[in-house]
């Protein structure tokens, strides 16, 4: 669990997100409260539940990015879902419990990656040893191969032992890259059959059954495939296989489930789309289904147990962050019980022209830095003058005001239109400097500025 102070969290979020200080403070406090909870005595710890957050603001102002960056900062399992994709029980579609299963899968991947990184040096050494034996005439067999039913496993082929001096010589050549062009033949385990993947869907996860685990010991299901590859790829395949042997899957599963339960973050986007305009008091129509989804979400947010293929998962201490534009509906249109489960309400401000200028300049991964890095691969040294950046922000703001306000996402299509010509011709231009000024911006984007009807077709 991250021990960042709220001020440090806000400072870190400032590197990627412009403005929205109220939302940053809210998520920073929520993250710190998780750390504080871990320091509390055991008898009180289970009684402290996270305070869920609902973000209200137009699209493109940073709601999703704040939640995503927070999860990375906390090194916590994170999943983003859209409330409008869910249907209530009895209707065709995704059920709300799938968000918990997705979170556990994200936690499994996160913990497995951490454990694989820990055993990386040892796996590298073992992979090199196997590759050296292979190149000296030995065999490399996959440990997951299963003999046909009724037959004893074949005896292992004789392996020509390599002396320590020869082994170190080969190892030095491997690491120096002098053997990169050599081809070797290795056996690798095949992935699960296609028909098995077709049966491992949502229905089986609901009852906590993983068919691939059930059938993994059936004779003939685990097959290997012989491949002829170059040494670097062979080393990568063997490294992956050795790392899988060194990582304890049971430990990964236990740690992942615990981390999902205690540190998991679920971002529920478009929650305004399931808000009934009558506040749940209306009659039939689609509002019935909307309210049904809300009532299905309610026990998960309150705290319940969900069956997954990795076991039972409790949702009592997961942090839920909901977000919505609420252009048509309003937060009070959600059912009262669900409103009460999101006690922290934060309103995000629409982006101004000054905000768009800062978004182009300040973030660590700003769009201008991205385009500059992309074109530098072709030898084109792209640069933007200050007046060009200001003009870009002004045009984006004007387009947002005259058509739909999509916030910072407008900058993506504005820049694509601006740099269309240089992106197309960069490979033919050769190494050169290319400066974008305000005059060039107005020239390239004149049609968007002058024709308001045309701008309605531009995202």
Curated annotation (Swiss-Prot):
Positions contributing to ATP binding: 18, 60-65, 269, 337, 409
Q: Which Pfam families match?
A: AAA, AAA_2
The GO terms describing molecular function are:
ATP binding; ATP hydrolysis activity; peptidase activity; proteasome-activating activity
Q: Which GO biological process categories is it annotated with?
A: protein unfolding; proteolysis involved in protein catabolic process
**Keyword annotations:** ATP-binding, Chaperone, Cytoplasm, Nucleotide-binding, Stress response
Q: Which CDD domains match?
A: RecA-like_HslU
Q: Does the keyword Cytoplasm apply?
A: yes
Would you tell me the Gene Ontology cellular component terms? HslUV protease complex
Keyword Transmembrane helix set for record: no
* Compartments it resides in: Cytoplasm
Q: Which domain of life is it from?
A: Bacteria
Question: What HAMAP family has UniProt attached to this entry?
Answer: HslU
The record's similarity note reads:
Belongs to the ClpX chaperone family. HslU subfamily.
- Cross-referenced PANTHER family: ATP-DEPENDENT CLP PROTEASE ATP-BINDING SUBUNIT CLPX-LIKE, MITOCHONDRIAL-RELATED (PTHR48102), ATP-DEPENDENT PROTEASE ATPASE SUBUNIT HSLU (PTHR48102:SF3)
What task does this protein carry out?
Answer: ATPase subunit of a proteasome-like degradation complex; this subunit has chaperone activity. The binding of ATP and its subsequent hydrolysis by HslU are essential for unfolding of protein substrates subsequently hydrolyzed by HslV. HslU recognizes the N-terminal part of its protein substrates and unfolds these before they are guided to HslV for hydrolysis.
Q: How does the record describe its quaternary structure? A: A double ring-shaped homohexamer of HslV is capped on each side by a ring-shaped HslU homohexamer. The assembly of the HslU/HslV complex is dependent on binding of ATP.
What is the name of this protein? Answer: ATP-dependent protease ATPase subunit HslU
Encoding gene per record: hslU
């Amino acid at each position: 669990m991250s021990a960042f102070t709220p001020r440090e969290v806000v400072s870190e979020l400032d590197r990627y997100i412009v403005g929205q200080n109220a939302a940053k403070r809210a998520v920073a406090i929520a993250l710190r409260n998780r750390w504080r909870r871990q320091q509390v005595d055991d008898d009180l710890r289970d009684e402290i539940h996270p305070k869920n957050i609902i973000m209200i603001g137009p699209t493109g102002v940073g709601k999703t990015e704040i939640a995503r960056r927070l999860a990375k900062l906390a090194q916590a399992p994170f999943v983003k879902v859209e409330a409008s994709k869910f249907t209530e029980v009895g209707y065709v579609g995704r059920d709300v419990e799938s968000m918990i299963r997705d979170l556990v899968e994200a936690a499994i991947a996160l913990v497995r990656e951490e454990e694989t990184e820990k055993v990386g040096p040892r796996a590298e050494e073992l992979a090199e040893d196997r590759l050296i034996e292979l190149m000296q005439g030995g065999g490399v067999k996959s440990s997951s191969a299963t003999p046909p039913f009724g037959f004893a496993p074949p005896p292992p082929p004789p392996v020509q032992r390599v002396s320590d001096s020869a082994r170190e010589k080969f190892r030095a050549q491997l690491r120096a890259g002098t053997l990169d062009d050599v081809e070797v033949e290795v056996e690798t385990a095949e992935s699960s059959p296609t028909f098995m993947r077709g049966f491992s869907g949502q229905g089986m996860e609901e009852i906590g059954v993983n068919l691939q685990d059930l059938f993994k010991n059936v004779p003939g299901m685990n097959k290997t495939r012989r491949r002829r590859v170059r040494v670097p790829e062979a080393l990568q395949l063997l490294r992956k296989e050795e790392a899988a042997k060194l990582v304890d899957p049971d430990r990964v599963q236990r740690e992942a489930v615990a981390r999902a339960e205690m540190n998991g973050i679920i971002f529920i986007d478009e929650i305004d789309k399931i808000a009934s305009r009558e506040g749940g008091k209306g009659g039939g129509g689609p509002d019935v289904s909307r309210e049904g989804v809300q009532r299905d979400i309610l026990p998960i947010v309150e705290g319940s147990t969900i069956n997954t293929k990795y076991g039972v998962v409790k949702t009592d201490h997961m942090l839920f962050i909901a977000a919505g534009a609420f252009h048509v509906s309003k937060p009070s249109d959600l059912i009262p019980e669900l409103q009460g489960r999101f006690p922290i309400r934060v309103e995000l401000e629409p982006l101004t022209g000054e905000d768009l200028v800062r978004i182009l300049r300040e973030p660590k991964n700003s769009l201008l830095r991205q385009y500059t890095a992309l074109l530098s691969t072709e030898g084109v040294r792209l640069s933007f003058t200050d007046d060009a950046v200001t003009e870009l922000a002004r045009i984006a703001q004007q387009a947002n005001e005259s058509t739909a306000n999509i916030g910072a996402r407008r900058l993506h299509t504005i820049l694509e239109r601006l740099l269309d010509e240089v992106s197309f011709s960069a490979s033919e231009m050769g190494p050169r400097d290319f400066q974008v000024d305000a005059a060039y911006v107005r020239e390239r984007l004149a049609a968007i500025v002058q024709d308001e009807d045309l701008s309605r077709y531009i995202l």
